[in-house]
């Protein structure tokens, strides 16, 4: 069945309700969950690729490439955020002589993100923004393309099985 306005409202409420606890979780814990999701995707890469082949009509190698790319997104964002301590660091001084900067580069969570996946790369172009949003401390409301709902369901199952808390991914 298709989602209606009530379903969307419920997903947004769940994402907003989960946000305070999720954003408070240390970067290392969010990264560990993201890495676990990537590991689960890796274990399921052939099943995910089979679904992509059936849904989108990709050949086996293209589908495997998309599934593996999504695994790589999850591992990359987890590693990147851990290595850079959540991306909170001072920026260098302005290149103009005598100008001292007091700027910081901070990636911080803002709330619920909406991620809408296209039909032609439904797993990778969902997984990339979802991984970035989650590791940063945002929650996600996801909508798969109408023609490719199976890959979205597989992504949701991976995140559930990895242990993401209720309302973090909707």
Which residues make up each language-model segment?
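Short, structured beta/alpha segment
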Residues: 1-54, 76
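Generic recognition of stable, solvent-exposed alpha-helical segments in well-folded globular domains
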Residues: 10, 29-36, 43, 47, ...
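Alpha-helical scaffold segments in carbohydrate-active enzymes
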Residues: 36, 40, 69-80, 158
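Glycine-/small-residue-rich active-site loops that bind phosphorylated ligands and cofactors
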Residues: 40-41, 59-62, 121-122, 147-148
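Proline-centered turn/helix-capping motifs that create local helix->coil transitions or kinks
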Residues: 43, 75-90
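Flexible, acidic loop-helix segments that line cofactor/substrate-binding pockets
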Residues: 50-68
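Rossmann-like NAD(P) dinucleotide-binding subdomain of oxidoreductase/dehydrogenase enzymes
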Residues: 53, 83-170
């Amino acid at each position: 069945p298709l989602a209606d306005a009530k379903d969307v409202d419920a997903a947004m409420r769940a994402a907003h309700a989960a946000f305070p606890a999720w954003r408070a979780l240390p970067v290392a814990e969010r990264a560990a969950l993201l890495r676990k999701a990537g590991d689960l995707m890796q274990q399921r890469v052939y099943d995910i690729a089979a679904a992509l082949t059936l849904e989108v009509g990709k050949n086996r190698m293209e589908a495997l490439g998309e599934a593996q790319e999504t695994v790589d997104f999850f591992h990359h964002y987890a590693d990147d955020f851990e290595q850079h301590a959540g991306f909170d660091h001072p920026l260098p001084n302005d290149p103009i002589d005598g100008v001292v900067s007091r700027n910081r580069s901070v990636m911080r969570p803002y709330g619920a993100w909406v991620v809408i996946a296209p039909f032609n790369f439904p797993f990778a172009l969902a997984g990339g923004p979802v991984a970035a949003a989650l590791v940063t401390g945002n929650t996600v409301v996801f909508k798969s393309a109408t023609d490719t709902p199976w890959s979205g369901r597989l992504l949701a199952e991976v995140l559930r099985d990895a242990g993401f808390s209720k309302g973090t991914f909707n």
